[in-house]
Regions:
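Interaction-mediating elements
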Residues: 1-176
Length: 176
């Protein structure tokens, strides 16, 4: 692996779940056969790891697989990390039910934080106290949130959180 500076080669190898080095104790319970689809999934895991650390432009620019012998392959990857990005401003558009301050509190991402796309996804939709759950738990089943990068200056990103609240759903009939 070349081109990586923000994450060590050792850590990148650990990120890969299905593609692994021969002769490591860690590989005892992992697959032994090289599978191209698993390698593609592992490459995406590497990019996801970079995205978590603020490297939203990270990409694997080259990769090659070369047969070493009958039983093993050598894998070469070149990574282009790009620059690290930070959150500058978060603005909310379309929210009428809850004030921006309350939504910012639930988002728990503030100016100067590393731009972590995984954390953004978790805090808007998958966490137990995610913003989506605030709406869903109050009957806004048609709610949607679209985080849009509206301005990128240097290493800073302005996010516009576009909310469509929709109508509140009500229960019409209950049959038991």
């Amino acid at each position: 692996i070349t081109g990586n500076q923000a994450i060590t080669t050792k850590k990148l190898k650990r990120v890969m779940k299905k593609t692994n080095e021969k002769g490591k104790l860690l590989n005892l319970f992992r697959t032994k056969k090289f599978v191209e689809e698993n390698f593609e999934a592992d490459k995406q895991l590497i990019i996801d790891k970079y995205n978590e650390l603020g490297y939203r432009d990270a990409m694997i620019v080259k990769d090659s697989i070369k047969s070493y012998d009958d039983r093993t392959v050598d894998i070469f990857m070149e990574i282009e990390e790009g620059q690290k990005y930070y959150l500058r401003n978060v603005t909310w558009v379309g929210n009428t039910l809850y004030p921006s301050e309350q939504l910012n509190f639930l988002l728990r991402m503030k100016k100067g934080d590393v731009y972590n796309q995984k954390l953004l996804e978790e805090r808007t939709s998958t966490d137990e106290d995610a913003i989506g759950n605030l709406y869903y738990n109050n009957g806004y089943l048609f709610y949607s949130l679209d985080p849009v990068e509206v301005n990128i200056v240097g290493d800073s990103i302005d996010l516009e959180m576009r909310i469509y609240e929709g109508r509140q759903a009500t229960i019409n009939k209950v049959s038991i």
